[in-house]
From Swiss-Prot:
One Gene Ontology term, aspect cellular component: cytoplasm
Primary location: cytoplasm
Lineage of the organism: Bacteria, Pseudomonadati, Pseudomonadota, Alphaproteobacteria, Hyphomicrobiales
A biological-process GO annotation: methylation
Protein family per UniProt: Belongs to the methyltransferase superfamily. PrmA family.
Entry protein name: Ribosomal protein L11 methyltransferase
Residues noted as binding S-adenosyl-L-methionine in the record, renumbered to the chain: T136, G159, D181, N228
Annotated gene: prmA
InterPro entries: Ribosomal_L11_MeTrfase_PrmA (IPR050078), Ribosomal_PrmA_MeTrfase (IPR004498), SAM-dependent_MTases_sf (IPR029063)
Function, in words: Methylates ribosomal protein L11.
Domain of life: Bacteria
Catalytic activity entry: L-lysyl-[protein] + 3 S-adenosyl-L-methionine = N(6),N(6),N(6)-trimethyl-L-lysyl-[protein] + 3 S-adenosyl-L-homocysteine + 3 H(+)
GO molecular function terms noted in the UniProt entry: protein-lysine N-methyltransferase activity
Gene3D superfamilies attached to this UniProt entry: Vaccinia Virus protein VP39 (3.40.50.150)
Length: 292
């Protein structure tokens, strides 16, 4: 049964906004959505939804209805997805990414790792987060800064994806880490990446939608919570997230466009967190907040 991709071509900022909109709209439906950079110099991006071919007519109409009010004039295009090994394909030409002392790399670039590096080997393929996106790189930089400056006894990586951020915490500090994701495939991939990086203890991985799991009560409250998701769900979950944060605890938030920064800050200031620092990477921001 063939798979297709419906996509629109736009700018990086609009692609992020479209991704945010589609994530909120499609929720837990059995479709995948993504943004892809096509041409960095000309700021050309694609926002895509992946589905089975027989769903095309229904989803074309739904996507058109969803996007038309805010993004008039966008043309929905189609690509038939060939039957290839996407994990291998995703790693072709993938260059190592440096963020502070961290270097995120594939197996083909192990020789690029230097003795002082905190190396994270990721074969993401099926899950978001190889370090190449500004949100992931910003989180890695912030994690290093926070763990250098503060005493952290345990951590939560909410929406772990490939597991790269949870692995980063364990690479810097031998503390217990809980990593969760709504997607069981992401959790499976994260477990493989954890094993690949030689982490044999101190890491719990769970499939959990939001905070609806006993794992949060079992492992929390947390001195550090990392959530690299999207602005809308981050805003909605602010009151819940703060209840799982230990007194004096730290939060790192990303997946946020620069234009959404104040809305997210407002939600977390309202939940009694203080803003400490913002890292800017292109049009994306990573926020550091603290519970007083």
């Amino acid at each position: 049964m063939s798979e297709i991709r419906l996509y629109v071509t736009t700018t990086e900022i609009k692609a992020g906004e479209i991704l945010d909109l589609m994530s909120d709209y499609f929720g837990e439906e059995d479709v995948a959505i993504a943004t892809t950079e096509v041409d960095e110099k000309r700021d050309i991006w694609e926002a895509s939804v992946y589905l089975m071919a027989e769903q095309e007519e229904e989803f074309r109409e739904r996507v058109s209805t969803l996007l038309a009010p805010a993004f008039p004039g966008l043309v929905i295009e189609k690509e038939i997805i060939p039957d290839v090994d996407w994990i291998a394909k995703s790693l072709e030409g993938l260059k190592p990414v440096r963020a502070g002392r961290f270097i995120v790399h594939g197996a083909h670039d192990r020789d690029k790792v230097q003795p002082h590096d905190l190396a994270i080997e990721i074969e993401a393929g099926q899950a978001f987060g190889t370090g190449h996106h500004g949100t992931t790189a910003g989180c890695l930089e912030m994690i290093e800064d926070v763990l250098r400056a503060r005493k952290v006894r345990n951590a939560l990586d909410l929406g772990t994806g490939s597991g790269v951020l949870a692995i980063a915490v364990r690479k810097m500090r031998p503390i217990p880490v809980l990593a969760t994701d709504i997607d069981p495939i992401a959790v499976k991939v994260a477990k493989e990446n954890v094993r690949l990086n030689g982490i044999v203890s101190g890491m719990a991985l769970e499939t959990a939608p939001g905070f609806h799991s006993d794992a949060f009560r079992k492992h929390g409250p947390f001195d550090l919570i990392i959530a690299n998701i999207l602005a809308r769900p981050l805003i909605k979950m602010a009151p819940q997230l703060v209840t799982h944060l230990a007194p004096g605890g730290t939060v790192i938030l990303s997946g946020i466009l620069a234009s959404q920064r104040w809305k997210v800050l407002s939600a977390y200031n309202g939940a009694k967190l203080s803003h400490i620092r913002t890292i800017w990477r292109n049009d994306w921001v990573t926020l550091h907040l603290r519970k007083d």
